[in-house]
């Protein structure tokens, strides 16, 4: 899978064996958490994380246009990461790979899964996440928007407010379009 190929690439960039094993253990733990929700959750997570935080381009609607970041992440995100990790992620050496995947990977998995939980079971701190379960747009669009608002290092209260604000926007957007008989699909 793309997730396993990404893991292999990331681990190959960490030269210290002890640090490589630590990231391997973190990776296994995080992927196991994701797969506890759905067998495809790891791929959906990487699509959402990379699109939300690092994609800088999207294919124009013209016929014959080349795929850009958004589409490339959706098809082969491991190749996109390999080609983009220096420019977009700032990962230039073994230590930067280690630090990035030790700190940011678990952070974004945690909040991706908290969003998943709040969509399924009402959370009074993030009520609009539950509402967009019924009035939202495709998860492939809403999940990147939710993660895009987060910054590693934000306080939990800030994060909850940001997520709920984005979910409120999505809900407002879809409800307004719906009651005005306008489409709000993926295209």
Segments (PLM) and residue ranges:
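Flexible coil/loop and intrinsically disordered segments
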Residues: 1-187
């Amino acid at each position: 899978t793309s997730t396993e190929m990404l893991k292999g690439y990331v681990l190959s960039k960490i030269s210290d064996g002890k640090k490589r094993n630590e990231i391997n253990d973190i990776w296994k733990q995080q992927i196991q958490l994701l797969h506890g929700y759905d067998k495809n959750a790891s791929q959906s997570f990487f699509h959402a994380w990379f699109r939300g935080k690092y994609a800088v381009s999207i294919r124009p609607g013209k016929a014959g246009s080349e795929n850009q970041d958004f589409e490339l992440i959706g098809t082969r995100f491991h190749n996109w990461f390999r080609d983009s990790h220096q420019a977009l992620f700032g990962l230039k050496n073994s230590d930067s790979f280690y630090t990035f995947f030790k700190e940011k990977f678990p952070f974004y998995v945690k909040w991706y899964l908290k969003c998943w939980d709040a969509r399924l079971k009402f959370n009074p701190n993030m009520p609009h996440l539950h509402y967009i379960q019924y009035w939202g747009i495709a998860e492939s669009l809403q999940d990147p928007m939710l993660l895009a608002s987060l910054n590693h290092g934000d306080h939990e209260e800030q994060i909850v407010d940001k997520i709920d604000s984005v979910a409120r926007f999505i809900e407002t957007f879809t409800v307004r379009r719906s009651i005005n008989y306008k489409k709000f699909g993926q295209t």
